[in-house]
């Protein structure tokens, strides 16, 4: 039985248990003649020993050894038996320094001495924690005291063994057979042990194991200081269970604060039988409390071959952040020449950090980029900056160009209290050629402009007020200057009372649109004059600036039942303009016999009746029970026509037609155009829902029936504008009595397979206006398999031409006919192929194609990918450059140390393959 002794600060408390104690409260421990005593545990927890007159116990002798780095019993060729005879010693244990980075099979053929559990013996929960390519895992066994948080000097020592002797004169206890010493969270095991009570020290020999809070150290011989927990294990191997890390050392020392010091130590995340990579150092320190390790005179070895040396390295032993160099990246382009980026990460505090990106470019010099991130109880944000003294002179003489290239920015979100929210998104660059010439690691979103916005929001119980100031700085010379909103004030809400169930809402907006037109000349990349900037092509009202106020009060009466609803709505739309127009704009209007009115307003009523029904039934399909719903919907919309051609367009466009367009109150976005409407939208949705709530399929279809032609159009798309350009206005289909048929659907074959599709067919022209079908496969239990097949078509493009500042229609270049295929597929558990092919049938060209392979194991990953791509604007579906780029990308990741090269590969894989991020998150 177990008896807990008293806690001593300088003299270790001792507890001895074993098979001899099974049948009696306290066992009698016997030794040979003149030195033999009968020792019992006293009531005070100490030892009560008296001479034993007739002792002839068959106990093993006390191990005789010296405190060498390797066990004497292991190193010698013979030892003395209890009867004085000489017996052959066991074969000499192999040294860890001879293992070449692998674990010692001589200790256990299946590496069970390192708590290694093969994959076939893991539980389902344990399998979920490792990748499909891992052959097993390090599983820490449950043991008493493993979660004990008491300090070592305040914890009693528990001891158990199969047999024991005690020399009272020397106060040495000798233990043999499955010896276990436990103090606090630390536990030491061995075949034999000596416990020196006077020195509070223990020595263990044979199959030594030291365990402490998720760490295991295995060796041949150990010394343990029992008053503070310090220990040394010789010929040591170690495991950090949660980090799936292991290593070895000539000897390992555990300090009082649980830091492990390794002499000639190694560190790796590879499986016990693998030496794919190891980090080896003269002196290695592992600190579980901080989650980091250090090594001096360190070499990175691949297959036991040294490939990299550093006098000092600081590396993670778990998932916590640390300061240090991040994986470098290198490339070569015609603009910059050879480029090398060596980022350095500063882990300044748990809630803020910084990253420095020194970028050497052979053609341009050294560029410095920096990023600072912070998080407080009420705010979060990023501050970034970059500077380059450009030594490339090919843009000398270009407007707005300077050799001092720079960027700075701030993104911040601050909750001032529970109602006030402040946001800043501000970036400024030195010149409009910045992103054409230079790459950046600062995560700036668009390469055609940078955002400069500040917003203050107040959220009341029944309203939301917002003050916004937003400007844009162009990062190109081929687009017109966008309008700034300086300022924009919105106030939206509803009244807190509902007489008779009525709901009263209101929306208000005041905004000042302004911009400074730039009509300077600009150059081609070869330095030749290309012409004036696009702002010079703006004509008439496109050159206007001014104030716009919009008021939108409304009332509705929702009538809802379990089987359906009817909601009539009445709104009043009032917009007032106070405009300015330069002399060039007025001259353009005069040439068209049009006049300019600086003060204009527009008032329109809006009537809407939205209604829907809900039906469901229980049905069975292919043996599977479903609940099928039928949800018809009808919406009538009336807005009278009012000529709006004399109003400028500041922030308005017309989105593509889809099923959602059936239920919009205005076919335009923004407030500069209110579409006239006298129409009835009819649609129906049906869903198939399984008993567990899983939606197997849904399909929607609908159409708009027009009782009047749509006369309000955007500039450039009016009947007068199209005739002036010799284009057929009937192509816009504004006088038909019905819209295209709109379809949208989704079908899930199971939780792994799904297909999404939308389709718009115009019966007036007997052609497909737009459509897409996207097939996605990614098993829920194995997200490492990904297949995407998609096709999209669009021929109804009404696009804003950013190079002319007007809308256009009927341009063949705007037609989209593209397929997109991407795949990640494992060939064998550790090898996968990755590929994407995006092709444009309209211009018979490949937009992007890449293919390669990936090798992934428990300790390292390699990707090699060949890529071809054009610079594509995904929002406008237009290629920005006809010149193709090509590259071969290599990515190497040593798990536990991070990427060595090629981390930018992640960017185009994440963007190009739907499901890639879920795959990586699951693998982690």
Curated annotation (Swiss-Prot):
Residues 66-90 have a biased composition (Low complexity). GO terms for cellular component: cell outer membrane; transporter complex. GO terms for biological process: Gram-negative-bacterium-type cell outer membrane assembly; lipopolysaccharide transport. Residues 1-33 form the signal peptide. Residues 58-102 are annotated as: Disordered. Its main location: membrane. Component of the lipopolysaccharide transport and assembly complex. Interacts with LptE and LptA. Together with LptE, is involved in the assembly of lipopolysaccharide (LPS) at the surface of the outer membrane. This is LPS-assembly protein LptD. It comes from Pseudomonas aeruginosa (strain UCBPP-PA14).
